[in-house]
């Protein structure tokens, strides 16, 4: 239960950082800010969110490490498969940069789904928050494609921002599920 609470909090923090960085970065783009400002915005957003959350992360870090350590006991082929699911789409960005917003959604979706499936298989844990993030990220692919090719075809920057917002929503949904589930279990015991 502590690991689920820790990951719920982590996912909420990721959601806040991605959502705020996406919005601020779009505002900077619309105002003609230089490219290096975008990097500063993203690093700053994650730094502020995770910096503000440091006291809580100190308390929940052992639970996060514990869940992550479980994957070190997986067979080598399983670790490789999980790594490809996470890293493959991100590596593909170098070859297909015009599809990066879709590849990011694909990487987050496949990575979370593979990790969920493998943890369930090898540890017996049902980390549904990870399933939710993965499933929503993959379900966001056609939505992002529709936004990019029709609704916002004349404003591709907005389509990119909205695909990032979809990532934030996916993490928010997974994090909220985890925290609500922990609260429900505590109330029933």
Give residue spans per PLM region:
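Membrane-proximal helix-loop-helix units in multi-pass membrane proteins
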Residues: 74-136
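Structural signature of transmembrane alpha-helix termini at the membrane-water interface
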Residues: 23-27, 52-56, 91-94, 110-121, ...
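Terminal transmembrane helical module of multi-pass membrane proteins
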Residues: 118-189
């Amino acid at each position: 239960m502590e690991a689920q609470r820790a990951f719920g909090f982590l996912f909420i923090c990721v959601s806040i950082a991605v959502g705020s960085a996406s919005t601020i970065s779009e505002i900077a783009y619309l105002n003609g800010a230089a490219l290096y400002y975008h990097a500063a915005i993203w690093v700053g957003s994650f730094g502020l969110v995770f910096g503000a959350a440091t006291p809580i992360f100190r308390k929940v870090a052992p639970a996060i490490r514990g869940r992550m350590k479980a994957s070190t006991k997986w067979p080598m082929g399983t670790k490789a498969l999980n790594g490809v699911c996470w890293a493959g789409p991100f590596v593909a960005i170098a070859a297909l940069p015009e599809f990066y917003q879709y590849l990011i959604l694909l990487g987050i979706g496949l990575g979370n789904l593979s990790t969920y499936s493998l943890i369930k298989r090898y540890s017996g844990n049902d980390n549904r928050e990870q399933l939710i993030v993965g499933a929503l990220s993959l379900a966001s692919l056609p939505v992002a494609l529709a936004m990019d090719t029709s609704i916002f075809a004349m404003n591709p920057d907005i389509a990119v921002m909205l695909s990032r917002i979809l990532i934030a929503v996916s993490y928010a949904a997974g994090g909220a599920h985890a925290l609500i589930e922990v609260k429900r279990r505590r109330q029933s015991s």
